[in-house]
Amino acid sequence: MAGAFFAGLASDVLGSGLGSLINAGAGAINQKVEFENNRKLQQASFQFSSTLQQASFQHDKEMLQAQIEATQKLQQDLMKVKQAVLLEGGFSTADAARGAINAPMTKALDWSGTRYWAPDARVTTYNAGHFSTPQSLGALTGRTNSRVSAPARSSPSALSNAPTATSLHSNQTVSTRLGSSAGSGTGVSSLSSAARTRSWVEDQNRNLSPFMRGALNTSFVTPPSSRSSSQSTVSTVPKEILDSWTGAFNTRRQPLFAHIRKRGESRV
């Protein structure tokens, strides 16, 4: 009976030990399998996250590139439209290109101030345009000569006292211009060089008057506040016109500012 007891006890101990070994081996195998599964899952998750980030970065890069190209095209189209408008308004090609990018454009200075230079403009305004529209030869040929013909070469006093055919509106001057260009009409030798020079000066004085008739009836005008070394410069323009281009308020007629002159104001 004691043998049977010990035999049963030994079988129980052996079975328990064998079961423990089996359970330990199965647990180790399960842990290894679970570790491998977790490692593969983490690798797959990292790979997916990296791929997603690369795709997102590539998408953002393409979108930014598309926005840059669209912005550049829009800016180019706007500059082309602005340049076309400036060209249509009479500005030169160089000034239209400058104005399309808001760069400084060529300005003209006359007795009324500065304005943008648009030589091909149809109308002269305060902001843009040329000085005046030159008169056509067809309108000039119908006018009659209202002055006496020019004398021959003589002394300067005789030229200054005697009336000469210096008007641009005379038939003789027009025929002289036609003769020099087309080879017909009165030759250039019909007028003396002094008479032709005086005719050219009067032509400039007439065509360069922007807003006031006779505003530029001047000879070798020295600009206001200039330091010209020439002593023969003279201006026949009134002082109000000389000072009209200054942007500051004109205090010339106020007693308190009698001895004060703004920068650029004439002292004649």
From Swiss-Prot:
Subcellular location, record wording: Virion; Host cytoplasm
Keywords carried by this UniProt record: Capsid decoration protein, Capsid protein, Host cytoplasm, Virion
GO cellular component: host cell cytoplasm; viral capsid, decoration
Bias (Low complexity): 145-163, 179-195
UniProt cross-references to InterPro entries, sorted A to Z: VP2
Region Disordered, residue ranges: 132-199
Bias kind Polar residues: ranges: 132-144, 164-178
Chief location of this protein within or outside the cell: virion
Summary of the function given for this chain in its UniProt record: Minor structural protein that forms a portal-like structure at a unique three-fold axis of symmetry, following binding to the host receptor. The channel formed by VP2 may allow the delivery of the viral genome through the host endosomal membrane.
SUBUNIT field: Homooligomer. The portal-like structure consists in 12 copies of VP2. Interacts with capsid protein VP1.
Other notes: Translated by a ribosomal termination-reinitiation process from the bicistronic mRNA coding for VP1 and VP2.
Free-text domain note: The N-terminus domain points away from the virion surface.
Family according to the record: Belongs to the norovirus VP2 family.
Protein name: Minor capsid protein VP2
